[in-house]
C-alpha cells in the first residue's frame, strides 16, 4: 500500500513539473527572439539636448550640448579642407551615430559616448582645434565646421524608421565592406558593399609596411605560439578567400589559417585589403584606410567634388536609408 502511495505521489509531481519546464524554455526563447534595436520614439531631440562624454585620458565625464559636441567630432574626424557637402555628410553621420548610442545604451555605464575613435568617435575641444590650425586658416575652418553642423541640425539617418549604426572610415580603397565581413555577428541591411571612385588621389589610399622575416614570425607568435613557417618551401603564404569588398577574408600563413582582419591587427596595417610579397623581407602593400564599413570620408569628399550633395553622399554609402528630422 505504501509503495502504491509513493508511486502515485511521484506521478503527480512529474505531471506538475513537466509544464513548468517547457514554459521556462519557451519564455527564454521568446526573450532572445524579440531582442531589437531601440526605436526612434525612445529619443526626443528637444528633450535630450545634452550628451555625457567620457574623456578616456582622464576618466572624467563632461556634459555638453549635443550640437556643441558634434562640432568637436566633425573637426576631429574630418579635415576642414574637405568640401562643405562632405563635412555636412560627416555631421549627419556623427549625429546619427551619437543618437544610436544614446538610444541603444553604449559601452559606457555612466556616459553616452567616449572620445576614443577606436571605441566611439574622436572629439576635440574648440580651443584645442583652433590651436592646431594655422592662424590664417582658423576663422574659415571653424566657420565651415559650424555650417556643417548647424545647417543639418536635427537631421539623422534612419532605416525603417530607426536610427542606423552609422559606421564610417577614412578610405575604402575603392569599395566598402559589410559589417558581417569585418566583425561577424549582425548583418545590417543598410551596410552593404558599394563602389567609390576618386579615392586613389588621397594620401590615405595606399601604404606599405616592410618587416624582416624574423619580425614577421615574432609578431604572429605573439598571438599564436604554435606558429611555424618555412620560407624555403613554396605556397607558405596563400590567400584563400576574398570578401565581397575585395579585402582578404582568409589567408594561409605557414601552418595557420587566419582572417585578413586578424593579420591587419597583428601588423597594425591600415586596411585588410593588402598583398604580401615575400623576398628577403616581407612587404605588405595596403589599399585603403580603416575597416571599410559605412561611409568613406575621402569617398564623400570625392563625391562632393563631383557635385553630389550630402544627402546623395549618405544614400550612396548607406543602402535604403532616409534622412529624417528629429
Can you say where each PLM-predicted feature lies in the sequence?
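N-terminal Sec-pathway targeting helices
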Residues: 1-13
Amino acid at each position: 500500500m505504501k509503495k502504491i502511495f509513493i508511486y502515485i505521489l511521484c506521478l503527480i509531481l512529474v505531471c506538475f513539473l513537466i509544464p513548468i519546464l517547457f514554459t521556462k524554455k519557451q519564455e527564454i526563447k521568446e526573450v532572445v527572439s524579440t531582442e531589437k534595436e531601440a526605436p526612434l520614439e525612445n529619443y526626443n531631440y528637444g528633450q535630450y539636448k545634452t550628451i555625457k562624454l567620457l574623456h578616456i585620458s582622464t576618466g572624467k565625464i563632461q556634459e555638453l550640448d549635443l550640437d556643441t559636441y558634434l562640432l568637436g567630432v566633425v573637426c576631429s574626424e574630418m579635415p576642414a579642407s574637405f568640401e562643405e557637402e562632405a563635412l555636412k555628410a560627416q555631421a549627419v553621420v556623427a549625429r546619427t551615430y551619437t543618437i544610436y548610442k544614446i538610444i541603444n545604451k553604449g559601452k559606457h555605464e555612466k556616459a553616452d559616448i567616449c572620445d576614443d575613435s577606436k571605441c566611439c568617435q574622436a572629439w576635440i575641444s574648440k580651443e584645442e582645434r583652433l590651436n592646431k590650425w594655422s592662424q590664417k586658416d582658423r576663422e574659415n575652418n571653424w566657420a565651415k565646421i559650424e555650417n556643417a553642423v548647424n545647417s543639418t541640425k536635427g537631421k539623422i539617418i534612419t532605416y525603417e524608421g530607426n536610427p542606423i549604426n552609422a559606421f564610417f572610415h577614412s578610405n575604402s580603397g575603392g569599395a566598402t565592406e559589410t559589417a558581417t565581413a569585418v566583425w561577424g555577428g549582425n548583418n545590417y541591411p543598410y551596410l552593404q558593399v558599394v563602389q567609390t571612385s576618386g579615392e586613389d588621389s588621397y594620401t590615405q589610399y595606399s601604404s606599405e609596411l616592410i618587416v624582416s622575416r624574423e619580425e614577421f614570425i615574432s609578431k604572429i607568435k605573439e598571438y599564436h605560439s604554435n606558429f611555424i613557417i618555412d620560407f624555403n618551401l613554396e605556397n607558405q603564404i596563400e590567400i584563400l578567400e576574398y570578401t565581397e569588398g575585395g579585402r582578404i577574408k582568409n589567408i594561409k600563413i605557414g601552418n595557420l589559417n587566419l582572417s585578413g582582419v586578424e593579420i591587419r591587427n597583428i601588423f597594425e596595417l591600415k586596411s585588410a585589403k593588402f598583398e604580401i610579397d615575400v623576398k628577403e623581407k616581407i612587404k605588405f602593400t595596403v589599399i585603403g584606410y580603416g575597416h571599410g564599413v559605412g561611409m568613406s570620408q575621402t569617398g564623400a569628399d570625392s563625391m562632393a567634388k563631383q557635385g553630389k550633395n550630402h544627402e546623395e553622399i549618405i544614400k550612396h554609402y548607406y543602402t535604403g536609408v532616409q534622412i529624417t528630422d528629429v
